[in-house]
Each structure stands twice: as C-alpha cells, then as structure tokens.
C-alpha cells in the first residue's frame, strides 16, 4: 500500500507558487488576446476586447471583495464604459487572465518532463489526429468497447481543492474560489441535467475540468498498468489541453545473454486501452465481457466514492466492437469485417477458404454536419445551399476567401475519412452557397454569376492535396484518385472547429 501511495503522491510533491501580482500585468492579457485570435479557424474571429487593462482588473477584483460588487457610481460609468456592461463581461476578463496564469506551472512541468526524457517535437503529441493512428493500429485487434460519458456534476470546492495539489499560493486560490462562487451562474449552463461550460469563458473551466479528470486518470492508469499482461517498464504522462497517455517503450526486455549477445523481447499487451477527449472516454479490450463488467463497476465506484460524482452504471454500455460505431471527434469510427474467399488447390482436390479481415473505418457523418452548416446559414435543414447574409461593405474577394477557408479547413480536418462522398457533398454546399451569396449581393441570378466567374472559381475549392496529386500524376488519373481517397492524418491540428464540434 505504501508503494501505491508513493505513486499517487509523486507528482503532487512538486507544488508551484503562484505569483499573485501576475493578475495585474499587462502581458498576461496580451497572451490571452493572442490565444483568442488563434482559437477560431473557421469564421472571422470577433476578437478579444483589447481595451481590458490591469487598471480595470484591479477595480474588478476590489469590487468583488466588496459587499455589493455590482453597485457602480455614475462617474465610473461615464469615465469608463466597461462598467456599463453586464456581468458576463467582468467574468470574461478575469477568467482569461486566470487561465493564462494557472497554465504556467503545468507548462513548466511539461517542459521539464520532456527535457528529462529527451523527447523532441512534443507539438505532434498535442494533435487531435494523433489519436486516430492509435485507434487504427489497436482497435482492429480488440473485441469489446465501452463509450463512457464522464460525469460533469463537479462541485466548485472540489475544483479548487484539486488545484491545491499543484499550487501553493493561498491568495490566488482564495480569489479563484470567490470568483467561481460569484460568477458561477454566468459561466455555466444547465442542459439536459448536465452542467456544461459557457462558450464565452471556456479556457479556465476546461483547465480546471482537465486537472480534475487528471486526478481520476492517475488512479485509472495505475490500475491499468497493474493489470497489464506485462507491466510497463517506462511510461509518460503528458498533461496538456488534449491529455492522453503516451507509451514510450513498446517492448519489454526479458532476457539477455552475454555469451550469445541475444535479446528476447515480448510485445507489451495492455489489458485495457483508454482514450479521452472532451467529456467522453473510450475503453476497449480484447478480453471477455465479464472482465469488462468488472472494470465498469471499478469506474463507477471510483467516481462516486473518491470524486463525489454520481455516476449511473446504466450509462456505460459494453458493446462488441465489430457491431458498434463510435461517434468521436467529428468521425463515426467502426471496425468492419471484410470477408474474402480464397480458392486453394491441393493435388486433385480444391476447396474454398473464407477469411475475414478487420478494418478500421472512419466516416464523416453527413447528417450532423449538415445540421451544423444549417445553423451557420450555409444551407437549410435538408442540405440545400442558401445565400448567407453579408455586410454591404464586404468585397467579393473577402467573401470568396471566407468560403474557401471554411471549405479547406473542413477538408483538412476530415482528410482521414475512409469514404469521401460526404466530404464532397459538404464542399458542394459551400461552393454553391458562395455563388448564391455573391449573386444576392449583386442582385443577379446564380446562372449569370456562375458564367461570370468561370471554371477557375470551381478549381479554387480544390484542396491542396488534390492540387498536388494532380500535378504529380497528371496523366494517371486512377492513381491520383486512389491516393487521394486514402486516409491522411495531419499532426498539426490542435483544436476542433465549431462546425465539426456538433456533439
């Protein structure tokens, strides 16, 4: 038991000090502003209110500690227009500053971990698409899978207590606790009995939520390693925006003989495979359903008795992987059996051999994606393209560039799809919606405006992959078509856009 306790206390022993004055530094909000500009990859970013300054933050924190923080004088409202805003505005300013500050100790911890283990190019480990090669490699050999929704009902005090393990600064923790209690109603929304964070203030709460889930995953990964067929000799945990488990060594050195200089290696076969992103986790194994049920109740008890979160066992279903589809990160992933018949001839006798190969498939679900396009006014609910309202001062090139950027971002993200038919339909919707938007602006028919644009306009909606392949294989169309239909996983995608994030 002492060995287990030491495992759990290993990383907690490194507490970092918060510098409380960081809340009043201008560059903290400059970093938050820079993050806001890079966050959106689909639409024109509305920007972050760059008028926020350390003076405003000082006034807000002072008023938070007062008995009536929302009572402002008339002079303040005239001299400073920010105090005429609603309560959400104040919470956004402080939460952005908090988010930048609380990430500093974890960033230092990550850098020191990478330097200690001599791991380079860690940015590729942060890519969302890095999960799919793992699924592609492992899931075709597994039998059972559980799609688990992690409970969101987390008390405020639990979030603060979790952060105390990593931060040794009472002033910042007290301010964080006061801030959460004061602005809780404006920072979360209740939907279908599940607490979700408001889109206006996601960064701080996603960090607090991930730090809370990190505690749970320490326990889970420890139990997982203990139950592996061969224990892991080396492992690394990377705590970032996208947190996942990274195995450094894939083989276990079992035997070494100095005389013959021979090394015997066994491939490590973990008992349970675990993937988590956002509020969903996936557990997969090739063992019997009975063992999967045991792990199911382990998770329920761990959540309820250690993390004080109510978890219904009925929400965890155990399914056969070959008969189940996972809706994960904008893809519908499944493992399908591809039957093949081989004719074998042996002397005068011939017989047929039926083989079934497992293949991991990733398909773009068209119905939810059309729903997202419909909400963004690119098409109606049936998928028919419509014109999108634009500002009168928008130029034609700006409108075309905007539609091209959306189309290429979607093509870039869904490049790992096994079948491109759904993706072609989405590109068709965006292309025709762009034409209708331009025709509406110039008060002309779609046919007339399309003739004016010509075929070059349609070629602009080709992705970079299609253009490159057409240049490499100009005459062998079948070869380029086959290559483009293949899956391509990009390791530079670190955020999921709004149209894909329809779950």
Curated annotation (Swiss-Prot):
It is found in: Plastid, Chloroplast. InterPro entries: Domain_X (IPR024937), Maturase_MatK (IPR002866), Maturase_MatK_N (IPR024942). It comes from the Eukaryota. Keywords: Chloroplast, mRNA processing, Plastid, RNA-binding, tRNA processing. One of its GO terms (molecular function) is RNA binding. Pfam families: Intron_maturas2, MatK_N. Belongs to the intron maturase 2 family. MatK subfamily. Usually encoded in the trnK tRNA gene intron. Probably assists in splicing its own and other chloroplast group II introns. This is Maturase K. The lineage of its organism: Eukaryota, Viridiplantae, Streptophyta, Embryophyta, Tracheophyta. The gene is matK.
């Amino acid at each position: 038991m002492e060995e287990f306790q030491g495992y759990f206390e290993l990383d907690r022993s490194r507490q970092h000090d918060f510098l409380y004055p960081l809340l009043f530094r201008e560059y903290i909000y400059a970093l938050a502003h820079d993050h806001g500009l890079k966050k959106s990859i689909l639409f024109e970013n509305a920007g972050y209110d760059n008028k926020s300054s350390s003076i405003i933050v000082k006034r807000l924190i002072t008023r938070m500690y007062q008995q009536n923080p929302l009572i402002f004088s008339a002079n303040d409202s005239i001299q400073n227009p920010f105090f005429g805003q609603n309560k959400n505005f104040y919470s956004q300013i402080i939460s952005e500053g908090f988010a930048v500050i609380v990430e500093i100790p974890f960033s230092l911890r990550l850098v020191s971990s990478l330097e200690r283990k001599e791991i380079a190019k860690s940015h590729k480990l942060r890519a969302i698409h890095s999960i799919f090669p793992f699924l592609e490699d492992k899931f075709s050999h597994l039998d059972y899978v559980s799609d688990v929704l992690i409970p969101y009902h987390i008390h405020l005090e639990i979030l603060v207590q979790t952060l105390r393990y990593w931060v040794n600064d009472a002033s910042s923790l007290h301010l964080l606790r006061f801030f959460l209690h004061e602005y809780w109603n404006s920072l979360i929304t209740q939907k279908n009995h599940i607490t979700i964070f408001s889109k206006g203030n996601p960064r701080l709460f996603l960090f607090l939520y991930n730090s809370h889930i990190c505690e749970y995953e320490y326990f889970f990964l420890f139990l997982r390693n203990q139950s592996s067929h061969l224990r892991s000799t080396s492992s690394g945990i990377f705590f970032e925006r996208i947190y996942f488990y990274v195995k450094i060594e894939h083989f276990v050195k079992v035997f070494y003989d100095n005389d013959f200089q021979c090394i015997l290696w066994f491939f490590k076969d973990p008992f349970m495979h675990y993937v988590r992103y956002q509020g969903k986790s996936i557990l997969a194994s090739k063992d019997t359903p009975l063992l999967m049920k045991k792990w199911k109740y382990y998770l329920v008890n761990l959540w309820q008795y250690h993390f004080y979160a109510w978890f219904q066992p009925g929400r965890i279903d155990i399914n056969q992987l070959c008969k189940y589809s996972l809706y994960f990160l904008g893809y519908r992933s499944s493992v399908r059996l591809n039957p093949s018949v081989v004719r074998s001839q042996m002397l005068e006798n011939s017989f047929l051999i039926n083989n079934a190969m497992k293949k991991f498939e990733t398909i773009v679900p068209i119905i939810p994606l059309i729903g997202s396009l419909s909400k963004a006014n690119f098409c109606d609910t049936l998928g028919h393209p419509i014109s999108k309202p634009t500002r009168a001062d928008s130029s034609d090139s700006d409108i075309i560039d905007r539609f091209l950027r959306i189309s290429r971002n979607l093509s870039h993200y869904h490049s790992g799809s096994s079948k491109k038919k759904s993706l072609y339909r989405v590109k068709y919707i965006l292309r025709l919606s762009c034409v209708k938007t331009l025709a509406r602006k110039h008060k002309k028919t779609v046919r007339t405006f399309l003739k004016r644009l010509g075929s070059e306009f349609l070629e602009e909606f080709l992705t970079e992959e299609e253009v490159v392949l057409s240049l490499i294989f100009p005459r062998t169309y079948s070869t380029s078509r086959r290559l483009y239909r293949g899956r391509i996983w990009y390791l530079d995608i670190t955020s999921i856009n709004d149209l894909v994030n329809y779950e």
